[in-house]
Amino acid sequence: IYDHGGTKAMIDALASPHEVSGAAHLPAAVAGLSSVDYIASGGCAVTAIRVEGPEPSVAHRCEALRALLAPLGDTEELHSKNSQTLWREIRDVIYFSEDQERHIWRLSVPPKEGSRVALQILEGQPGEALYDWGGGLIWLALGAAPDACADVVRQCVAAVGGHAMLVRAPASVRERVSVFEPQVGPLGDITSRIKEGFDPNGVLNPGRMHEEH
């Protein structure tokens, strides 16, 4: 499944009555990094849908989901240890941990816009994406750049009402690029006033979760 198809699969599964507890999409290059052989050896993108609960209920819901998603691609079930390993890898974003040269962004966007936003960003620079939360959370690993591609990332994310946070980059990049989504105008003023109200001396987590004004 390509990224757009993966987004549709996640949205359809989450919108179904089958109590899906997790939905993630691994493009082919990312899936190939998994330690789960069945995932890594396929040579294709993988959309993972998690179902939990009593065994009879899980079996019934899996069957229904496979029928629902069959038009989008082949479906297989992943059980016990392999399933746990895959979801742990996704949670920990383990696929992007090896190459320390790449810059890591965490994007929050409307799920239906996830693949479009990521592909727009990746059109102009090398990198990989990992989609979680049904496409609403995107982890981007981008090639090293002096500004971590911040303008492109934030423009694409802002266009759909999302926000972006730079999670990993060298100190030299962090010195010139805001780690958190810049808060300008009234929103920035409100944030500053609230913080000053309960922390007038600025001793509680300075610079955490937003840039100082």
Task: Give the location of each predicted region.
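C-terminal substrate-binding/cap subdomain adjacent to the FAD-binding core in PCMH-type
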Residues: I1-E98
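Conserved glycine-rich FAD pyrophosphate-binding loop
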Residues: L72-H213
